[in-house]
Amino acid sequence: MSPRAARRLLVLLVVAALAVLVLAPTVKRVLRDITLPLQYTSVIRAQAHAKRLDPALIAAVIFAETKFDARTSPTGALGLMQIEPSTAQFLAHRSGATTFTLADLADPAVNIAYGSYYLRYLLNRYGQSETLALAAYNGGETNVDRWIERAHAAGARFTLSSIPFPQTRAYVARVEHAQASYARDYGL
């Protein structure tokens, strides 16, 4: 290789290295935004504060339910946090909402408020256990009550591995993983 070609190659390598250094944070941020999206941060933070919840938990539930892409599920659950109509009516009654309609759940702020209210309710019901609250959010309170009874009857503690529904067990693990990621990557 000629000295002139070697210099060109060296300059090219230096420019490439600088480009990588400059673009790496942007690429990392873009990849994070694709693989771990986050929207409605101010609503999430406000609801977390109002309901005494970890904002990363709210974001993780939204991620597990819809990846921040609101849509109606085949079961009829609504909005970002996929709230079942019967659960929404229960929450509206319990919270004293007087003008609530199911259509309100299409509004991300309302949906996050109701989903956060439900998470707080479940955490209170299950002794602040996020595992139990998340299992109930996904698998239903009646099922969780039954699973707790079975575990206690067997003289065991209820743990993630105690959940007999593979979908619910995977859901809880997915939310817990996403919660840690939101706390780490977004500082929630």
Each language-model region and where it sits:
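Basic side chains
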Residues: R7-R8, R174
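N-terminal Lys/Arg-rich, disordered targeting/topogenic segments
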Residues: M1-A5
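Hydrophobic membrane-insertion alpha-helices, especially the h-region
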Residues: R8-T26
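Catalytic glycan-binding domains that act on GlcNAc-containing polysaccharides
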Residues: L23-L188
